Amino acid sequence: MRSILVLVALIGCIAAGVYKIPLKRITPPMIKMLRAGTWETYVEGMRKRQLQLLKEHKVHIQDVLGYANMEYLGEITIGTPQQKFLVVLDTGSSNLWVPDDSCYKEKRPDRCLVSNCDAGLVCQVFCPDPKCCEHTREFKQVNACKDKHRFDQKNSNTYVKTNKTWAIAYGTGDARGFFGRDTVRLGAEGKDQLVINDTWFGQAEHIAEFFSNTFLDGILGLAFQELSEGGVAPPIIRAIDLGLLDQPIFTVYFENVGDKEGVYGGVFTWGGLDPDHCEDEVTYEQLTEATYWQFRLKGVSSKNFSSTAGWEAISDTGTSLNGAPRGILRSIARQYNGQYVASQGLYVVDCSKNVTVDVTIGDRNYTMTAKNLVLEIQADICIMAFFEMDMFIGPAWILGDPFIREYCNIHDIEKKRIGFAAVKH
């Protein structure tokens, strides 16, 4: 009996390891919309929806900009044989979901998406195909899945069906579907993948129209299970429960590549630190709440402005901007003659301004510099990498990609703490 126990222990040790998933940097949809002149229309629609969500008590942190400013994507696979998906690795949410094969069918023609195909007699008379008059709500919403990788459960011999459904409200629409269980692999096929068997994931039957304008297929949530829709275990929690990692941690490194698109953008390291990109000294801060990666931010300063009011903050890999209270941002903007553009919800600043912001977490100050805080939209037109958080429920600050490009984030799931280490230059 003892020999069997020793063998099991040895197998567990062999199975545990450290894995890496490289990231691809894309231009955030927000930046593309600003350049195309469509951002203000997007913001108007988003604000109307968010007010409705607030009334219905459905607002989550991931709703703030509806993934309009996500910047880094990684590759995962689901099923056996493997089916590929590009996902946002998002510490601001907890569910893994990808489009299901049922989300789009070729038999639902694009001609059904014209305005004359609304329900009723008008549809029957004027629509180019009478079949479009049936289930018109579906016809109008399927297009977002058309060009996505979609999961086909019939093609996976490790798939397990469940009877649970899910729905997540975003700032610009929603995603909904049902849960399945299958083998999830973090990393591209043929690479050194973290293989997580029998993992819950969402199969989206519908995704908001906004997602049709993005490269992503789905979302890989990396926050805690308490935040998960349906209460299902996030894949990384499942991996830790199965003893697949050397340590119950993961490390995030984002590389500053300017405005380049489709290039290497950093790496997630599962089960260990990242000595190749992060300095050895790590300062940890205990989480105040283990739902998001939430902690106390003691103070902020920039040039002649400072405040030690103290706020709740989260680290969020799914946003290319930082979020902060309105009063704080307006005080910071004044230091650099920045102007708030209400219709855009953003702060315009001279591209030559050396915007720096220090935040205090625990006993340490962390500096964000102009290379990460001043974003060029067009020639001689720049914005500060911040948005206002005042209308949202929850933490007052989001430290997003501008902060993570300065400091590697080490997420300690077991000890419920987050660590920060300076990026190597």
From Swiss-Prot:
Keyword flag Repressor: no
Regulation: Inhibited by pepstatin A.
CDD domains recorded: pepsin_like
Main location: secreted
Domain Peptidase A1: 72-421
PTM comment, free text: Cleaved into a mature form.
Subcellular location field: Secreted
Annotated Gene Ontology cellular component terms: extracellular region; lysosome
pH dependence of this protein's activity: Optimum pH is 5.
Enzyme class: hydrolase
Function: Aspartic protease which cleaves several human serum proteins including hemoglobin, fibrinogen and albumin. Appears to cleave preferentially between P1 (Ala, Leu, Val, Phe and Gly) and P1' (Ala and Leu) residues.
Family: Belongs to the peptidase A1 family.
Protein name: Aspartic protease 2
Natural source organism: Necator americanus (Human hookworm)
